[in-house]
């Protein structure tokens, strides 16, 4: 809460990776543009919406140049109108070839973006399938029940 958005994104590359501040600042600016927040570079976390904070968190993670991004319910705490902002950034990452593992209940997003769906229940992987197969013809009874409940409600 005491550093600006751009300083927040620069912090780990400078401290952990040893990047020069100027290089880290330039990269952070590019990442903010990538997540649609270049205009918020000098803002502080308290000045951002939940969706903006989540997109800054994505930019901060990308600043470390990871080979894989892990997302655990990235939209669960967001107001409905903010969900699309975050999902659009994640769609862009997928289109750019970023490997992502995402725990989500956003089934439309999973259907559109995933290469593989792993359906889990109580910590166990019950089914692994392509999105087309999973949503059309799930093999496990628990997966069928889950999808049926989604379609009913």
Residue map of PLM features:
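Conserved ABC ATPase signature
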Residues: 44-48, 52
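A short, proline-enriched helix->beta-strand linker immediately N-terminal to the Walker B motif
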Residues: 63-67
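Catalytic Walker B motif of ABC-type/P-loop ATPase nucleotide-binding domains
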Residues: 69-72
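Hydrophobic anchor residue at the start of the ABC signature
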Residues: 58
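Short coil-to-helix segment of the ABC ATPase nucleotide-binding domain corresponding to the Q-loop/switch region
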Residues: 3-11
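A short, surface-exposed alpha-helical micro-motif characterized by mixed small hydrophobic
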Residues: 110-112
């Amino acid at each position: 809460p005491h550093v600006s958005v751009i300083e927040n994104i620069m912090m780990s590359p400078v401290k952990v990776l040893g990047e020069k501040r100027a290089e880290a600042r330039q990269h952070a600016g590019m990442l903010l543009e990538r997540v649609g927040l270049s205009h918020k570079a000098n803002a502080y976390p308290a000045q951002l919406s939940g969706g903006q904070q989540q997109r800054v968190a994505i930019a901060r993670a990308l600043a470390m140049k990871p080979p894989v991004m892990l997302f655990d319910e990235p939209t669960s705490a967001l107001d409905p109108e903010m969900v699309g902002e975050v999902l659009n950034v994640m769609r862009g990452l997928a289109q750019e070839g970023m490997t992502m593992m995402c725990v989500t209940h956003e089934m439309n997003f999973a259907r559109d973006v995933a290469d593989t769906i792993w359906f889990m229940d109580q910590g166990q992987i019950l089914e692994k399938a392509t999105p087309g197969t999973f949503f059309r013809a799930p093999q496990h009874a628990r997966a069928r029940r889950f999808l049926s409940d989604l379609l009913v409600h």
